[in-house]
Amino acid sequence: MAEEPKGVPLSELSLQQLGELQKNCEQELNFFQESFNALKGLLTRNEKSISALDDVKIATAGHTALIPLSESLYIRAELSDPSKHLVEIGTGYFVELDREKAKAIFDRKKEHITKQVETVEGILKEKRRTRAYISDAFQTKVQSQLATMNTQ
């Protein structure tokens, strides 16, 4: 059987090694924070899509509306068939669906993104805890070296 890998106690690392470890941990923390923010943005966009489906539900054929092409660019368009919705199912892939199927896709996306948010949230908590341990070890090491220098 393979043995479980053993870590090196933080107290045995030099100041330089602790500094590098702290820097790496900070970079990882920033990466996961950016991922978390991006996922929250996706969740918000998905919620807006679900809300838009509800808004179109009450519309009739010939209804005029502003359609978003991007977050800041809208065009005026006429709704030809309020029962059909164009839904992005992948990068650059769209499919025309009825309201129930479109809502089901958005609900699945919401569920998937929510799970990803929860996963990244857990990783962020762990990374913050690790950063605190490393920071404490670094401070302890600095104080220890200062005390050693003062006694000499």
Curated annotation (Swiss-Prot):
Family indicated by similarity: Belongs to the prefoldin subunit alpha family.
Protein keywords: Chaperone
Entry-linked NCBIfam families: prefoldin subunit alpha
Molecular function via GO: unfolded protein binding
Pfam families: Prefoldin (PF02996)
Gene Ontology annotations for the cellular component aspect, listed alphabetically: cytoplasm; prefoldin complex
CDD domains: Prefoldin_5
UniProt source species: Caenorhabditis elegans
Record note on quaternary structure: Heterohexamer of two PFD-alpha type and four PFD-beta type subunits.
Disulfides per UniProt: none
Protein name: Probable prefoldin subunit 5
Highest taxon above the source species: Eukaryota
Example GO BP: RNA polymerase III assembly
Function: Binds specifically to cytosolic chaperonin (c-CPN) and transfers target proteins to it. Binds to nascent polypeptide chain and promotes folding in an environment in which there are many competing pathways for nonnative proteins.
